[in-house]
Design a protein with these regions (language model features):
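Stable alpha-helical elements in mature extracytoplasmic
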Residues: 100, 112-115, 140, 171
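Glycine-rich, acidic and aromatic/proline-enriched surface loops and short helix-turn segments
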Residues: 118-121, 141-151
Length: 221
């Protein structure tokens, strides 16, 4: 199926929709402008009109998309919850505007540190993956949920997934708690240094006093 200007669908069950698009692999789909599945079966590619350079697919059963002004995905009808991949960005950013949030509760940083210290950590791979090349670091969702899944008002996450926004939040809370510990240690060290300097001054004064007394006693003899 080919629909649009210079749209070509050259193989079995291939679909091309748009302008200057080519679906040249079996069961492949090309949509938008200036994209091609490049003969790779089962692949899909979508492109905007920001360029006249054709974006090609490089693998079978793969997906490629080009949108020069980014991607915006929403998970509610009001479009207030979701994630952005902005223009020229290389990572997704979660919507985090304070004006879109409510029911704020403070978090005990020391409690978070304790929970992290008690949480099992592993290296692991998903079932069926190559153990030599596809290993990972990190906790299990069940352990993370057991430690941080409730906050006094409701549930946070579930016991099979780890939300990266929550994971980042826990890490920042822990870092803040460690910074408070570090600041307290620095203050204690500063006070200890002051006391040590005063003690040294007193010792020096006593030594000088003893020296003068010994000198006086020597003259009396």
């Amino acid at each position: 199926i080919a629909i649009g200007k210079n749209a070509e669908a050259n193989f079995n069950s291939a679909i091309a929709i748009g302008n200057d698009v080519e679906a040249s692999g079996s069961y492949s789909t090309a949509m938008g402008s200036y994209v091609s599945t490049s003969g790779f079966a089962g692949s899909m590619t979508i492109g905007d009109r920001s360029t006249t350079t054709v974006m090609e697919t490089f693998v079978t059963n793969g997906y490629r998309a080009r949108f020069a002004n980014g991607y915006r995905l929403f998970t509610n009808s009001a479009a207030t919850i979701g994630a952005f991949l902005n223009a020229n960005a290389n990572a997704w950013a979660a919507l985090s505007d304070v004006r879109l949030k409510e029911n704020f509760l403070p978090v005990d940083g020391e409690g978070v540190l304790y929970k992290i210290s008690a949480m099992p950590q592993y290296t692991w791979n998903y079932i069926g993956q190559d153990v030599k090349t596809l290993r990972h670091y990190g906790p299990m969702a069940q352990d993370f949920y057991a430690a941080f899944g409730k906050d006094g008002l409701g549930e946070i996450g579930c016991d099979t997934l780890i939300n990266q926004q929550d994971f980042l939040g826990v890490n920042l809370i822990a870092i803040q708690a460690l910074e408070k510990r570090t600041s307290a240690i620095k203050e204690d060290n500063a006070r200890t240094k002051e006391l040590l300097e005063l003690t040294i001054q007193r010792i020096n004064a006593l030594e000088e006093e003893n020296r003068l007394l010994r000198k006086q006693l020597k003259h009396k003899r």
